[in-house]
Amino acid sequence: GIGGPDRPPHPETIETLCTESRKSDVHGYQPYIGLPELRRAFADWYNRWYNVTLDPQKEIQPLIGSKEGILHISLAFLNAGDGVLVPNPGYPTYSSVSRLAEAEIFTYDLDENNHWRPDFKQLESLPLDRIKLMWVNYPNMPTGAKASMELFTKLVDFGKRHNIIIVNDNPYSFIRNAEHPISIMEAEGAKDVALEMNSLSKGHSMAGWRVGVVVGKKEWIDSILTFKSNMDSGMFYPIQAAADTALALGEEWFKELNDIYYGREKQAYELLDALGCRYRKGQAGLFVWAELPEGY
């Protein structure tokens, strides 16, 4: 199923939306690149939670939900026949958008014995000279595997050695993730080879508001903006203002949210135990990934 949060956003976020919507001068078209205030809010947020420094004028592109970023990135960097690495299991949109871009899809397996992480030996056996881009998603959906700096460092090194753009889809880093959330952009040299998408859908309970972001070096953000500006428009001003409010929320918000999710996790474990399913504790994100018993 879809990982759709059922909790409302923070009351202050909703209040900002309502207050701004009542103003008479906020209902026109907005800049494709997003409001300067929102880009600054994303930069501050990345610095606060991930210890990553980003230039809000050059390295941040707000999105109408991070899902659209998959399309924009694919169209910006993939030509017909280019290879793209897609995880299995993984988010189906990576493959469907790659087909729209007429790219050649190479799947790479995520295996429980390897902690649901890429097998770099398997990757090295692929025709990497034909591959332009690699989709990764950590914390992972649907397996719940958490991110690590060791993994991100390996991915950055892999991308550099083979001239492959690494794109980390990172909407789950604040959900059932007791450790400090991390970003691939923390890895040394990541800006040379990586992009990262993030979202307010999960960690801020704003799935229907459609607020996301892609971050990376200026040249790549400019390329993405070129495609985006020909496909959609800027977000509604009050939504951008409310997103600014949401991005300023502190640890208390995430603790309250995760207390609810951890309570549901406990109930899910009890149900899975009753059914005889096998699962691993300590997963992140909105899912519990489990193996059905024999006979089902």
Q: At which residue positions do the language-model features occur?
A:
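N-terminal small-domain helix-loop-helix segment of the aminotransferase-like
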Residues: 1-65, 72, 247-249
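Short acidic capping loops at alpha-helix termini that bridge into adjacent secondary structure
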Residues: 53-60, 80-83, 130, 191-194
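Conserved PLP-anchoring active-site segment centered on the Schiff-base-forming lysine
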Residues: 76-98
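Helix C-cap/helix->beta junction micro-motif
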Residues: 101, 161-162, 275
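Active-site phosphate-binding strand-loop segment of PLP-dependent enzymes
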Residues: 110-182
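Active-site PLP attachment segment
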Residues: 180, 186-223, 235
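Structural signature of PLP-dependent enzymes
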Residues: 224-231, 246-270
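Conserved glycine-rich beta-strand-loop-beta hairpin in the small C-terminal domain of fold type I
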Residues: 244, 259-272, 279-292
